[in-house]
Amino acid sequence: MSAGGAGGGEGRAPFARFTDQVCGQILFRPAHRRVREELTAHLEANAYEGAQVHFIGHLQTNKVNKVVGKVDLIHSVDSERLLRAIDRQADRLGLVQDVLLEVNVAGELSKGGCTPDEAWELAQLAQSLEHVRLRGLMAIPPIAQKPGDNTPYFSIMKKLYVDIKEKIAHNQDDMDCLSMGMSGDYEDAIAQGATLVRVGTALFGPRPPMAKQ
């Protein structure tokens, strides 16, 4: 479960406490530059010790060293370059980093993510690397205007997830995460097999605007 972005202002502080104390999970989608900087500083300071921390959002290859080994799961691997960079950093640290492949299931130009065909290639690569563990797939479809709008996209993701798990994964038990669905469509996502949803707006209302620097 995710608020869609923690650390984005005082209005989101209750969510961070809620996930830390009740769920034991903090999931970040650092869409704003200042939020990314604050998150990086908190990770380096090990401020979330004891919580399960997930990273959602674009991860630059030059920032991999600030995230690998400091979060439990990276949701947004979408290129060979990034996957190999994560593997190299995990190798340096002597650990295995859990990752999800981000799939741009609707082919939206404004969003990151690989194509479904590229997901097959990245999944095969992940199986050959020693210091990453592929846990599943992640997708962020278009904003749903009404119930059922995103069911076709969720169905595509479920099939892709099952096919990759059955045909590529060396250990199918490792492939246990299908991260998709937000406040407007999480019920449809769960109906299609989602294991992780991001419902911060449904729980706590709209995110307050970022203060201008």
Give a label for each model feature.
Residues 12, 32-184, 190-192, 204-206:
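Conserved alpha/beta-domain cores
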Residues 1-4, 18-23, 35:
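Catalytic lobes of large eukaryotic enzymes
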Residues 210-213:
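Active-site loop ensemble at the mouth of alpha/beta enzyme cores that anchors a bound cofactor
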